[in-house]
Amino acid sequence: PRIEDVAIAKGKIIDRGQDLNYTNAEKVIDAKGLWLMPGLFDIHTHYDLELEVAPALPESVRHGTTSVVIANCSLGLAFGSQRDGINDPIVSCYARVENIPKSVLKNCADNVDWENPKDYLNHLDTLKLGPNVVVLLPHSMLRIEVMGFDDSVTRDPTDIELEKMCNILQHSLGIGYVGLSTDALPFHYLAAHPHCEKTIPTQFAKYRELKKLTKVLRDKNAVWQATPPKDSVIDTLKTFLLTSARVHGKALKTTVVSALD
């Protein structure tokens, strides 16, 4: 750390040093005893639901965070509640993964009034957000949207369904989403019958599906957020192989939770 003056004009630092001349400055802030630092960028959060009740995210901002990434680990609200009359995906997917009471999740789902990725971004624009919010497209919800909840955890997608997933991802990247989030942690289970013994939909995706989706990301210079299948060395290696520039001709921007307890 250094003790010095900082001159700012039009939102940019134009000078810094000891005892700057501030005679013509419009405003002088005495920051003696305080720290001046860049805003923190929190790249892995699960604030999707919290934004709906406390969009200012004061507990995050007060620590110096100015930007957050949401919809990590394949879970998010990009497609709305996705209720089908029987299944309640927000409740089932979030309850055990995020340890949130089902009653709270149900109330959140009741208040969702959008049904697609574009309308979700428009919804976020109506909130009085504290930090900047960056959104990933959640893979579990993408599978549910294309295949239906029950099928998303019982079978592979057809060629047509996989192509539709790729098209939705490509469109979403074009309107402001920065990437795709997936998950492979073995303790992320669903919370509603008859699927309580099954993990969230993203974990049913085979290598072929992930390869197709990550190709879209690579072509668009977008980001793949992932957690590796920690119980399988082979599957973990295959996961990281998808990021290889040598194999695929171009590097893939990736953020991976690689250190696990």
Residue ranges, per PLM feature:
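Histidine-rich, glycine-flanked metal-binding segment
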Residues: 1-39
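Structured core elements
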Residues: 7, 42, 69, 132-136, ...
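Short coil/turn connectors at secondary-structure junctions
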Residues: 23-26, 32, 36-38, 63-66, ...
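Short low-complexity, flexible loop/linker segments enriched in glycine and/or proline
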Residues: 29, 82-93, 194-199, 240-242
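Di-metal (Zn2+ and/or Mg2+/Mn2+) metal-binding site signature of metallo-dependent hydrolases
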Residues: 34-57
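Acidic, glycine-rich active-site loops and adjacent beta-strand->loop/helix elements
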Residues: 46-49, 73-76, 230-231, 260
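Divalent-metal coordination cores built from histidine and acidic residues
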Residues: 53-179, 217
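Histidine/acidic residue-rich metal-binding segments in metalloenzymes
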Residues: 118-129, 154-261
